[in-house]
Amino acid sequence: MQISIRNFAFAPVDITVQAGATITVMNEDSTAHTLTASDKSFDTGTIDAGKSSTFKAPAKSGSYPYACTIHPFMHGTLTVS
């Protein structure tokens, strides 16, 4: 599963995955970003422009809002089924 970052937005914004799924975040933007869960259950750390980061979805099902900690207007939801 992959989430892309471009033009200061996540694509897709909302994503549904299985528990423990591996998710790759590709930063296709011209500046650094993060993808960080509101409850801190996952966090890519800073992803520089043109780079990627991978994380595991939580083991517990539910909805996990996330945002970029550098640009908090960027947000979405990871749903674990």
Question: Where are the model-predicted features located?
Answer:
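Extracytoplasmic copper-binding redox domains, predominantly the cupredoxin/blue-copper superfamily
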Residues: 1-81
